[in-house]
Amino acid sequence: MIGGLFLSTLSFVIVSNHSIVNNTANVHHIQQERVIVQQHQVVSARTQNYYPEFSIAVLFVSFLALYRSTNFKTCVGILMFKILSMTLLGPMLIAYGYYIDGIVTTTVLSLRFVYLAYFWYVNSRFEFILYNTTTLMFVHGRAAPFMRSSHSSIYVTLYGGINYMFVNDLTLHFVDPMLVSIAIRGLAHADLTVVRAVELLNGDFIYVFSQEPVVGVYNAAFSQAVLNEIDLKEEEEDHTYDVS
C-alpha cells in the first residue's frame, strides 16, 4: 500500500536525476542545443508515464481513507497511520517538493476525517472515527459496526449462548435476553429489541433483533435422518410426561 501511494514520487525522482545528468553533460558538450532538445523529449515521455502512476496513487489513498475493519486493534493501528499521514507524511512530501503526493494524501484523508467527525459530534461517540463508518450499533454502551442487509432492512443477528452474546469482538453477559436492546445511530436511526432466540443443535443461540416481530423460523438445514431423530426424542419426552 505504501509503495502504491508514492509511485508518482519515484517517477519525479527519476526525472530529476536524469535532468541533473543531462545538465552536467550539457556544460561540456559542444552541441548544447541538440542535447537540450533530447532532454526535453525524455522529460515529456516521463511526464506521460506519470498520469497512470498518479491515478494509482489516488486509488491507494482512497482505499486507505475508506478501509474499515471490525477488529479493535486493527482499527487503532489504521487510525494512527492515518493521523501520521495527515499531520506528518503529507506536509513532509509537500516540503520536499512532491506537491501532488502530499496534497492528495492530506486532502483525501482530511475530508474523510471531517465527514466522520460530523457523526462524532452529533452522537458524541468517537467510535465513528475509530471504526471508519457512518453507522454504528450500540448494545448497552458497546459500539460495533452495523452491516446493512441487501434490501436495506434494519435488523441484527448476534451469536451467543444461553446467557451471553458476542458483540463484534466483545462478549455481553445478561440475565434475560429480552432486556437486551440495540440502538442504531448514524445514517440510520432505529431501536431494536430481541424478537426471537433461535437455539441450535449444539446448544448455542442466535438472537434476532428487529423492529418487527418474528412470526416463525423455518428450518431447512437438517437432513431427514436428523429430523427423524429429533421427532423420536420429542415423542419419548411426551410419553414420559403422560405416564407421570
Curated annotation (Swiss-Prot):
Primary localisation category: host cell
Note the coiled coil stretches, chain numbering.
Answer: none
Top-level taxon of the source organism: Viruses
As for subcellular location, the record says:
Host membrane
Annotated transmembrane regions: 47-67, 75-95, 102-122
Q: Which residues form the CoV 3a-like viroporin CD domain?
A: 135-214
Disulfide bonds listed in the record: none
Q: How does it sit in the membrane?
A: Multi-pass membrane protein
Does the record carry S-adenosyl-L-methionine as a key word? Answer: no
Positions of the CoV 3a-like viroporin TM domain: 41-131
Q: Which Pfam family, an example, fits this chain? A: Corona_NS3b
Which family is annotated? Belongs to the coronaviruses NS3b protein family.
For this entry, the protein name equals Putative non-structural protein 3b
Q: Which organism is it from?
A: Porcine transmissible gastroenteritis coronavirus (strain Purdue)
